[in-house]
From Swiss-Prot:
Superkingdom as given in the UniProt entry: Bacteria
Protein's name in the database: ComE operon protein 4
Membership in a protein family: Belongs to the pyrroline-5-carboxylate reductase family.
Gene Ontology terms: biological process: L-proline biosynthetic process
Function, in words: Dispensable for transformability. Not known if it can act as a pyrroline-5-carboxylate reductase.
One MF annotation (Gene Ontology) recorded for this entry: pyrroline-5-carboxylate reductase activity
NCBIfam families the record matches: PRK07680.1
PROSITE patterns, sorted: P5CR
């Protein structure tokens, strides 16, 4: 199957690299383009057989599955340019959360899906969030799932939980990274540990914790209970976390949903739906 990618920004590049390195797709069967073509050529420097084009017509016409990896408000004008070349048998996949499959289906003649990836997919791990349009046939669904299974655990979701699911899967690594950095900074500030050692210890702790959860020996609450011995130092640390966290994550979700609604409103004005 030939796959085209429109947009080689952060997530577009992650998908391209992950598909190649997982052997989900051969680079010779992939065509990429970008508004700044030098970014696409930079990828070709690493994967020589990948195809690069500046022609949207060529990319759309010569590929069966097309990933749109551009910003939400860039999708509508992009589709206006691609529309003459889209066929009924094309599989069009958007990776951005504010654009709904129903909006795409009203505008294009082909099969439509939304796949929201995560930076964790770069390690061929984590979840990808999949929403199929009503136009998406069983064969297309199978192709999308098979492709995403090479780099992730594809989880089919309905539109009403898109934002919270994206917050956990896609934004989550950034949220956790921020918290770990503050954890490291506090350790360095409060004790004599070096930043280099604190980073190493935290990194290995996170890797080990991930592997431990993967074994399913412990749930998160069970893991906490195993470490948090009654009367021990961990319990004192948990007390500090409880007083500090409070409604913090509630506010995180409130903020992301507020921005999401703004993005949805802007997209609706473009699609008139």
């Amino acid at each position: 199957m030939k796959i085209g990618f429109i947009g080689t920004g952060n997530m577009g590049t992650i998908l391209i690299e992950s598909f190649i390195e997982s052997k989900a797709a051969d680079p010779s069967n992939m065509t990429i383009t970008n508004r700044t073509i030098e970014k696409a050529l930079h990828i070709k420097n690493r994967y020589n057989s990948i195809n690069v084009t500046e022609s949207l017509e060529k990319l759309v016409s010569e590929n069966e599955m097309i990933f749109i990896c551009v910003k939400p408000l860039d999708i509508y004008p992009l589709l206006a340019r691609a529309l003459p070349y889209l066929r009924k048998d094309h599989i069009l996949i958007s990776i951005t959360s504010p654009v709904q499959t129903e909006q795409l289906e009203q505008y294009v003649p082909c099969q439509v899906a939304r796949v929201i990836p995560s930076i964790t997919n770069r390690a061929l791990a984590g979840v990808s969030l999949v929403t199929f349009g009503t136009s998406c046939g069983e064969s297309a669904k199978a192709k999308i799932n098979e492709l995403m299974q090479h780099i992730s655990h594809p989880l089919q979701i309905e539109s009403d939980i898109t934002r919270v699911a994206s917050d956990i899967v896609s934004c989550g690594p950034a949220f956790m990274s921020y918290l770990i950095q503050r954890f490291i900074d506090a350790a360095v500030s409060e004790t004599s540990v070096s930043k280099q050692d604190a980073i190493l210890m935290c990194k290995e702790m996170l890797v080990g914790m991930g592997k431990l959860l993967e074994t399913e020996l412990y749930t998160l609450p069970a893991l906490q209970e195993k470490v948090c011995v009654k009367g021990g130092v961990t319990g004192e640390g948990i007390k500090a976390l409880e007083s500090g966290v409070q409604d913090m994550f509630h506010r995180v979700f409130q903020n992301t949903h507020m921005k999401y609604e703004e993005d949805i409103s802007a997209v609706k004005k473009q699609f008139h739906v």
